[in-house]
């Protein structure tokens, strides 16, 4: 009997192992199947042959019709060469998403880890965290690819600048600062793609190039919008994240946008695609259109007279892949009409097929490849969920804390009223471009882990159109030891296709907050969920609301993270990655006005902290802690000589063109002592700003470095920051030339400042 049971268990174990193997490797071999004798010996299938030669061999075997069938996101199969069809469009903005058709949840892959929305994660100012998230997302992406339910080409991240606070997609971005956006882009991309420059774990894509930050405002939509942008703003704002993504992140793809820039659709502009991305920055990858944007430039923008001209213009400009059917429908006729050469099509395929080969898609059996072991057991793991919680904790920003109202205490605040339309939020917490989360902890569930809760929504939803639920909310606050109001926005207010018209809380939310605060017995904590900034000046000024927290969209573990912050299990260290403007900022400021700098003749106030110096609700970089940190600039040079290449004439006026300076290893080293003089251990986000010498070129200040450092109570830590002079202390003139201003540059870290003088020199001798 025992032997029979053992035999039965052995059979069950065999089937479990077998089914697990099937789950991991349920995808058919994409190409170069070693079991297919007809194709296994083809040169493009030989791993010993360099990838460029394999790509050329494959293209040489294709007919024109077959080549064109590979130009769209839904690439056709080439059965005679043993190549399966492939869907290029997958998304992984902050976790594997099912927005694109390349990824489907279900079966043994019901979900994936959903991290905080990008704007929240960026508030951590933690580049190592950003890269760690990328590694987790790519592990889960590879696992789903192995299981036949995901792709390997992910059109993420979105690295556009949050230029205008009304933009519905601001939540997807790394905020308003171009250096932060670029650092985020490079870090997340490295996490996604891995560290092998010749091989890829997955292929990332930085989007949407360029000057795209308007979806649908006041009758103007992204499909019709012509962004009129100066060379100065292109160089020092809009292009910076993309340049860093390519040069520092080695991204495998760039996506061009729907809008025109100075009258030319971005996806048909050779100056943007071929000259800038490909030749100047050295993209090692492919350029893809935003979905249907090639069709948009013909059908909607009427940029060309015929569809064949639109196809030809896009490919000749440097576009390699069309998200949509347009190139597939019109490229053959463009070749027949001599608008396009077949070699132009070949050049596009070189870039896409090279990426597929770097991904291992032409290397045969998945199981034999470096990531072939990944499967269902590697998705939604406890470690991944823990990182999602950590990311939310690090990104949450404490905006106000008068009288040390926070953290709450489970002993003193035994009963907490949890009120507001986002108090029981789940899907709202993951923002847009998300997938199916592993599970959710809502704010009220998180707080219930620390205290008894009285839950009243107060508003049916974030639109808060009436006050019929107000009385119950007020009564809950009257009877509780503390009150937490979870208010804000969701995707019905701000999203793709939805730009805001106001920075105020929607509907009657402000009235609910004020009425509850007035009646509450204990401290009132306002928690905000949003991607963009909100004008909550009323709450900042209200003494009955002693604490305010911005949670952004904190991801699947958001409720736990919020509760951990409120009750002090985690010490907040996040900083705002965007300026919070008052509602009055929008007066006479159309979203269509692209100038970053003030335009006094039009009463345009300037955009972002770099160029706007008017009143704010909260400034860029604002964020409090439960402890207190001090800075001391312990060591920094007072003079840095800038060696000039060639003749003395390269020093013009009060600046040196970066192209004329010897920039290699030209670095400003600053040693900063950070001391925790408070009563709790904490992590401090140190932001380093530069104030260049005055002049019409220069921003009033610009972020040049940031570091996140954990400091225990009473501890002092010395942090070294190295600032690349040519990259970060330069400014851009009106012609779009990057220059190093000669003279005194102020370096500011909190309340500490230091002046360093940059001086031109020849052969080590400083020139006045």
From Swiss-Prot:
- Cleavable signal peptide: 1-23
Active site, per annotation: 290
Q: Name one GO biological process term.
A: xylan catabolic process
Keywords on record: Extracellular matrix, Glycoprotein, Glycosidase, Hydrolase, Secreted, Signal
**If researchers knock out this gene, what phenotype do they report?**
Partially redundant with BXL1. Bxl1 and bxl2 double mutants have shortened siliques and curled leaf edges.
Query: Where do glycans attach?
Result: 126, 648
Q: Which GO terms describe its molecular function?
A: xylan 1,4-beta-xylosidase activity
Q: Write out the tissue specificity statement of the associated record.
A: Expressed in leaves, stems, seedlings, roots, inflorescences and siliques.
Q: What is this protein called?
A: Probable beta-D-xylosidase 2
Designated gene of the protein: BXL2
């Amino acid at each position: 009997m025992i032997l029979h049971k053992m035999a039965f268990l052995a059979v069950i174990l065999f089937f479990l192992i077998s089914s697990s193997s099937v789950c991991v490797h349920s995808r058919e071999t994409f190409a170069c199947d070693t079991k297919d004798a007809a194709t296994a010996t083809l040169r493009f299938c030989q791993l010993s042959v360099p990838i460029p030669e394999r790509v050329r061999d494959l293209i040489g075997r294709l007919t024109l019709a077959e080549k064109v069938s590979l130009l769209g996101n839904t690439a056709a199969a080439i059965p005679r060469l043993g190549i399966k069809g492939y869907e290029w469009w997958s998304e992984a903005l902050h976790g594997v998403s099912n927005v694109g058709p390349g990824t489907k949840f279900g079966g043994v892959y019901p979900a994936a880890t959903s991290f905080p929305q990008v704007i929240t994660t960026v508030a951590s100012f933690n580049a190592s965290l950003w890269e760690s998230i990328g590694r987790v997302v790519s592990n889960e992406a590879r696992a789903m690819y192995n299981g036949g339910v995901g792709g390997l080409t992910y059109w993420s991240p979105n690295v556009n600048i949050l230029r205008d606070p009304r933009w519905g997609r601001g939540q997807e971005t790394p905020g308003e600062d171009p250096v932060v956006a670029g650092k985020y882009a490079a870090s997340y991309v490295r996490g996604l793609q891995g560290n092998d420059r010749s091989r890829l774990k997955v292929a990332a894509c930085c989007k949407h190039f360029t000057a795209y930050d308007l979806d649908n405002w006041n009758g103007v939509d992204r499909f019709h919008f012509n962004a009129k942008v100066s060379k100065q703003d292109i160089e020092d704002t809009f292009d910076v994240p993309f340049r860093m993504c390519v040069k520092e992140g080695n991204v495998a793809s760039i996506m061009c946008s729907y809008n025109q820039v100075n009258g030319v659709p971005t996806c048909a502009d050779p100056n943007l695609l071929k000259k800038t991305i490909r030749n100047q920055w050295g993209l090692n990858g492919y350029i893809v259109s935003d979905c249907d944007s090639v069709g948009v430039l013909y059908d909607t923008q009427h940029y060309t007279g015929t569809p064949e001209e639109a196809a030809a213009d896009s490919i000749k400009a440097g576009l390699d892949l069309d998200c949509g059917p347009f190139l597939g429908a019109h490229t053959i006729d463009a070749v027949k009409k001599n608008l396009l050469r077949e070699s132009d099509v070949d050049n596009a395929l070189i870039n896409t097929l090279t990426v597929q080969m770097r991904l291992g898609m032409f290397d045969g059996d998945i199981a034999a490849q470096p990531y072939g072991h990944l499967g269902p057991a590697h998705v939604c793991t406890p470690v991944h969920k823990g990182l999602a919680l950590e990311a939310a904790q690090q990104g949450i920003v404490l905006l106000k804390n008068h009288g040390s109202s926070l953290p709450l205490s489970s002993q003193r605040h035994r009963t907490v009223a949890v009120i507001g339309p986002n108090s029981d939020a789940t899907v709202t917490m993951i923002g847009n471009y998300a997938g199916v989360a592993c599970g959710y902890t809502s704010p009220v569930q998180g707080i219930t882990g620390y205290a008894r809760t009285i839950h009243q929504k107060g508003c049916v939803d974030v639109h808060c159109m009436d006050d019929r639920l107000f009385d119950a909310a007020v009564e809950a606050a009257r009877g509780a030891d503390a009150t937490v109001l979870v208010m804000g926005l969701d995707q019905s207010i701000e999203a793709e296709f939805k730009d805001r018209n106001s920075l105020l809380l929607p509907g009657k939310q402000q009235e609910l907050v004020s009425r509850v605060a007035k009646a509450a017995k204990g401290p009132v904590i306002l928690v905000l969920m949003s991607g963009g900034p909100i004008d909550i000046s009323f709450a900042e000024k209200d003494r009955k609301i002693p604490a305010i927290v911005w949670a952004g969209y904190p991801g699947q573990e958001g409720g736990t993270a919020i509760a951990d912050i409120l009750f002090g299990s985690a010490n907040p260290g996040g900083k705002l990655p965007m300026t919070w403007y008052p509602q009055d900022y929008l007066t006479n400021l159309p979203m269509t006005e692209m100038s970053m700098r003030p335009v006094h003749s039009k009463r345009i106030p300037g955009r972002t902290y770099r160029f706007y110096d008017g009143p704010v609700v909260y400034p860029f970089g604002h964020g409090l802690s439960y402890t207190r940190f001090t800075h001391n600039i312990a060591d920094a040079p007072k003079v840095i000589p800038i060696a000039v290449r060639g003749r003395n004439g390269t020093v013009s006026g009060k600046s040196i063109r970066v192209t004329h300076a010897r920039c290699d290893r030209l670095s400003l080293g600053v040693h900063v002592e950070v001391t925790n003089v408070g009563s709790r251990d904490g992590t401090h986000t140190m932001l380093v700003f530069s104030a260049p010498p005055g002049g019409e070129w220069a921003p009033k200040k610009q972020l040049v470095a940031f570091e996140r450092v954990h400091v225990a109570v009473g501890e002092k830590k010395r942090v070294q920051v190295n600032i690349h002079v040519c990259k970060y202390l330069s400014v851009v003139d009106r012609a779009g030339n990057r220059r190093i201003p000669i003279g005194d540059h102020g370096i500011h870290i909190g309340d500490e400042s230091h002046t360093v003088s940059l001086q031109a020199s020849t052969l080590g001798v400083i020139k006045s």
